[in-house]
């Protein structure tokens, strides 16, 4: 739900559709102009293609650019610039959903009976680094979902999550406030999120529960640094990627490496950074 809410917020600001067709995301890729059966969910980096034929075992997804796409549920990697890849799509399983390299997707994963009951639930950040730079970016917008306080009192959270290189063998994952420049509504670098606003205070206990990063080389050490400069060494699990044999219903030749950080001890609405020491 946070991905949808953020997509609708972006749409309210720039007028672009929540479900973006291939031609809108890649306007210079003429080969993708007639692809009308798959879509990107806002600016999240999630590419979705539901099966629409009886008895389908897979779908063929068109990939426009030279980038890795990670299956959200399996971690399989797909790459075929200007080509199509077969992705499993049994009707009894998940809808095919690929996360484009270069994106960060914040999700709430606890199943509730209503959105209101999720209000203070923790988040998981899914990070798919870009193929060349190991960089990524994603946005999150939240308000109370009930009133006009977001408009009248600037009571909302507007966060930007970025993964960048921080010198040889080091990466930095950071949380900062979004600016008008970030969402292309102005040239201003002033933070959109007003510090200490009512919604920020109401959700001040909402934490990041897990961070999952695909496609990294081996990770040696991770340190979290909060807004006050306090540092904490974090435990994590790292699983190396492996090769696999493509099939007629699954074109992936690789299972991505997976880094999982449980309880990184950071809050969703505050500034913080996490430093990762990786193999060169």
Predicted features and spans:
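Short acidic/polar inter-strand loop motif in beta-rich domains
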Residues: 278-280
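Catalytic core of carbohydrate-active enzymes
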Residues: 1-229, 240-244, 255-256, 261-275
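Long, continuous compositionally biased terminal/linker segments
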Residues: 250-252
